[in-house]
Amino acid sequence: LANTAKAFAPIDTVTVLGAARTLTVSTTAAAIGGDNKETIASIRTNAPFQYATQNRMVTPEDYTSIILRNFSTLINDICSWGGQDNPEPKFGTVFSSIDFESDVTAATQTATKLAIELVKQLAVISFNVEFADPVETFIETSLFYQINPQLTSLSINSITNSIKSVKQDYFTANTGKFKKAFRRSAMLTLIDEVSGAVLSSRAVIRMQQRIVPVVNTFNKFTLTFPAPIAKPAANASPTDADYIVKSNAFLVDGAPCRILNEQRANIATNKLQVVSSATGTIIVDNIGSFNTATGVLTITAFRPTGVLGGSSDIKIAALPANQSAIVPERNNIIKYDANASTITAVTTEADN
């Protein structure tokens, strides 16, 4: 593809009034809009859009069709839905969420959305069009597999690397677009097939979203996960695995801390706290809460003084009520966070 190309040079001079002149090339914008050769699967997906409803926009699917027909080279995926199906119903409105290709600049995205506004004249009834940004939910996996080393000539490290590759391939093939669900059983089936020495596997699944706080300022965030959140359960001696909600580390007054739901001896609630990573001391007692039924998590008066790891975001992970499947709706996209995922081999002498 020629996308992002921005350095151009003439291959020859031009003659003006008998004299050779060297051309000077100025680039006003990098090349965009190119696309890979279509696969059979993409042809099956896109072909109906080329004959979309005779240029009439009646249903949400019609909006998707017309937009894709005109801007398909800029768009990785698109989803449209009626305002009546929105979490906060808005009748007379069609919502569209566009996941642009990675090489499309913010300026081009804005210009594309403005151009799409013009297609409203194709609607047979007066509808408003509103754009909703895609909401990315990352899957974290804590995978454990049982292996009998005597049943293979390969090392455990080699088997682990193969499992890591298979797991990444599963997410690449099955997630990353609208309406693409994560199914734990499908992933574990592929892992069990990596080697005859792999006797079984299991995985703990967490949903993760990210916030970008302004340091030294009180921040407020509302996260909506694509599935209900598990209910906190009291435990006499809770461990880190018992937390329903937990974040990666950030700084508060120079000390590493995490966001955790309240979880101590025989007490477990949906209240969120800032807790010292080193000592477990509660630094801020209440910075929000989460609703287990709706999957909505609210953070208020959150004031970090720094973010670790050279990143600008903080990862907030929640344990889903049903770890078997995470099925996104509307503008939700499921992705995979390999860096927040782990693989642990458990050796056994059993052969079945």
Place the predicted regions along the sequence by residue.
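An aromatic-glycine-centered, glycine-rich loop/turn in mixed alpha/beta architecture
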Residues: F131-A132, N157-N248
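Catalytic P-loop NTP-binding/switch module of NTPases
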Residues: L1-S65, K335-N352
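Hydrophobic core positions in small helical hairpin nucleic-acid-binding modules
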Residues: A233-P256, A325-T342
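Carbohydrate-recognition loop of C-type lectin domains
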Residues: Q54-F178
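Extended, charge-rich low-complexity regions and/or helical-solenoid scaffolds
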Residues: Q84-G92, S97-D99, D133-V135, P149, ...
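Small/polar beta-strand repeat architecture
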Residues: F302-K335
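Extended, beta-strand-rich, solvent-exposed assembly scaffolds of outer structural proteins
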Residues: A173, N248-K315
